[in-house]
Amino acid sequence: KPLARGYAVKYTDAWCATFVSAVAIKCGLSDIMPLECGCEAMISLYRSHAVSRWEEDESITPQPGDVVFYDWQDSGSGDDRGAADHVGIVSSVSGRVLKVIEGNFSNSVKERTLEVNGKYLRGFGLPAYYTKTDNKEDFDMDINEARKQLTSCADTGDTPSAWAEEAAEYCKRKGIFNG
């Protein structure tokens, strides 16, 4: 279910979009990556964003740091226009193979491998990284460091990474997680 901005996320909520937003905040990219806790609402923000954009064509080859949206009800017979159910961040691209870091993948942070234009792809959020090339971020990152951080913020094991623990504590202090 889509949830509005300003919504205090609960532990029982799906948290894939919240994860993408938390990574964007941690990397100082909230001005080019729409922040939201629901997939469809995040797509709406990409569609109306001043510099970043929504790409409906799931056959494009995204770049590391782009945001991929899924529709688990996709039949695989043509362009999918259903509601997005899940979201992650492209971590690497090799030919037509994508690796995507996802929060709420079996209730943890993991990496998924899939093909460009594969079944379940809904579309892509394309952050305007080019606007960051001459600017320093809140965390003094240049564009290359921002992309590196964005695509490496996940721990694929069962033990939470130090970053995940720090992010969780931050979210609790700021009231983002509401028990």
Where in the sequence are the language-model features?
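Generic recognition of cysteine residues
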Residues: 16, 27, 37-39, 64, ...
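N-terminal capping segments
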Residues: 1-29, 176
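Soluble non-cytosolic domains of exported or imported proteins
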Residues: 10-18, 56-62, 158-162
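A structural signal for well-ordered alpha-helical scaffolds and beta->alpha junctions
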Residues: 13, 17, 94, 117-118, ...
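N-terminal propeptides
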Residues: 135-179
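Active-site signature of cysteine proteases
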Residues: 93-133
